[in-house]
A protein has these predicted regions:
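Generic alpha-helical segment signature
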Residues: 41, 203, 319-322
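Alpha-helical packing segments of well-folded alpha/beta enzyme cores
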Residues: 6, 44, 48, 206-209, ...
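Active-site-proximal binding-pocket segments
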Residues: 230-421, 427
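Trp/Phe/Arg-rich N-terminal binding region typifying the photolyase-homology
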Residues: 1-157, 265, 377, 460, ...
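Glycine/tryptophan-enriched, flexible segments
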Residues: 115, 136-298, 408-409, 413-479
């Protein structure tokens, strides 16, 4: 999207502005060769290239293109800045620990050449120290944070950056510099199933998704919990990679609620966007959450380890736990790179509180597979489910996977979509095939242990083990 802080500030400050994007080898080289995120980013870079060309043409600056590089961010940006003889480089803030280190390296490499680096807030409405308690401390509980966030919100915070007004400063890359977005193969990647999934990069695709969602937003507060229903916005990947600005989304939610005098759906969606900002400020103020419990006492929880734990983790990853809703959810993430939000909570709770496994193992699996992966939200979500987070569910609250299945997929539609081998089981039995009698199983063509696994854990017994595991930590807490 061109509603972008860094682009606006660069255009406003300079006579000539070149736009560049670096495919960072330090990120890409450790990824699997088929990675939906890389394909999405490449599509989005191509769309941005076309958007910039059109913007240039509208302002009598033909030949404006996105300059694309593939290498180390610090090396490529410094080299490009020298080649173009620029005085400053503009970019946006990113509080991911890797991004902070990368930006420091870029700043250093530019400083060696006498070039400034200016970075701006863009990825959130309010960042870092903008929402603090009365005593100047960061919030550790969501509800008061949300109240302060809403109180601080004003029209100015949500304005789109008026890039068009200053677009005449856009410059075409000099001859011989090279531009254009490299093919996926040139980046070392292969095509995924994004096209079949109808997931498209770029701001036009994002706007189309937003338009579609706004037709359904009034039902969001109820529909969002049912994975078989088209309830969510599906905009997470666009928000993650900046093809649609957070300002645009908050404006849409607020305007919709105002137009309807009130909309529980729009309010619930806005609340989710604020949760994202809450987790971003937690990451900024408490960077130890990467790798450690937000509440340090929970680092003492003794999770299962060893061969049996590794086998249980593999079964969870592959969707072979014997709990159909959990397994269908894992099939969804493995096949599409997306998982419904309710199911993110269910699968996380199952891993930690049914299987007794360390939440960091699940966090890493989601980080590798989710197309909309953001460190702060993923970490926050996992620590919420594991009861180790700043404002997590209580440690004694343990999701019952069967209750969740019957409540949120009552007819088994989602389960049937991802576990077709269970499709002929009745609505009452599909949630717990092990409870079906031999006649029902035979009629459905299901042999447990062959077509579908027996449960790898008994929920009632697992619940007792989890209560004991967390109680042990609570009882040794200093008073």
């Amino acid at each position: 999207s061109t509603d972008q802080a860094a682009l606006y500030y660069a255009l406003k400050a300079a006579r000539r502005v070149w736009c560049a994007f670096v495919f960072d080898r330090q990120i890409l080289d450790v990824l699997p060769r088929a990675d939906r995120r890389v394909e999405f980013i490449r599509q989005s870079a191509e769309a941005l290239d076309a958007e910039l060309a059109a913007l240039g043409n509208r302002h009598d600056t033909p030949g404006v293109r996105l300059i694309v590089r593939h290498g180390s961010a610090a090396d490529e940006i410094a080299a490009l800045a020298s080649e173009l003889h620029v005085q400053a480089v503009y970019a946006n803030h990113d509080d991911d620990p890797y991004a902070l280190a990368r930006d420091a390296a870029v700043r250093g490499a530019l400083a060696d050449r006498g070039i400034a680096l200016h970075t701006s807030k863009d990825h959130v409405v309010f960042e870092r120290n903008e929402i603090l308690t009365g005593s100047g401390k960061p919030y550790s509980v969501f509800t008061p944070y949300k109240a302060a966030w809403l109180k601080t919100l004003d029209d100015f915070s949500l304005k789109a950056y008026p890039v068009e007004r200053y677009a005449a400063a856009l410059a075409a890359p000099p001859p011989g510099l090279g531009h254009g977005v490299p093919a996926l193969a040139a980046l070392g990647f292969v095509k995924t199933n994004l096209e079949a999934l109808k997931v498209h990069g770029g701001s036009a695709a994002a706007e189309a998704l937003l338009d579609d969602f706004l037709e359904r937003i009034d039902e969001y507060d109820t529909a969002r919990d049912f994975p078989a229903v088209k309830g969510p916005s599906y905009l997470g990947v666009h928000l993650r990679f900046g093809t649609l600005s957070i300002r645009r989304l908050v404006r849409a939610a607020r305007d919709h609620a105002t137009a309807r005098r009130s909309s529980r759906g729009a309010s619930a969606w806005l609340s989710e966007l604020i949760w994202r900002e809450f987790y971003q400020q937690v990451l900024h103020h408490l960077p130890h959450v990467v790798g450690h419990s937000c509440r340090p006492e929970y680092d003492r929880v003794r999770f299962e380890h060893g061969k049996h734990a590794d086998e249980a983790f593999a079964a969870w990853c592959q969707g072979h736990t014997g709990y159909p809703l959990v397994d269908a959810a894992m099939a969804q993430i493995n096949q599409t790179g997306y998982m419904h939000n309710r199911l993110r909570m269910v699968t996380a709770s199952f891993l930690v509180k049914d299987l007794g496994l360390d939440w960091r193992r699940g966090e890493a699996y989601f980080a590798e597979h989710l197309i909309d992966y953001e460190l702060a939200s993923n970490n926050g979500g996992w620590q919420w489910a594991a009861s180790t987070g700043c404002d997590a569910q209580p440690w004694f609250r343990i999701f019952n996977p069967l209750t969740q299945s019957r409540r949120f997929d009552p007819e088994g539609r989602f389960i049937r979509r991802y576990l077709p081998q269970l499709a002929r089981l009745g609505d009452d039995l599909i949630h717990a095939p092990w409870q079906a009698g031999p006649i029902d199983l035979e009629a459905a063509g299901v042999v447990l242990g062959r077509d579908y696994p027996q449960p790898i854990v008994d929920h009632t017994e697992a619940r007792e083990r989890t209560l004991a595991r967390y109680s042990a930590v609570r009882s040794t807490q200093p008073r």
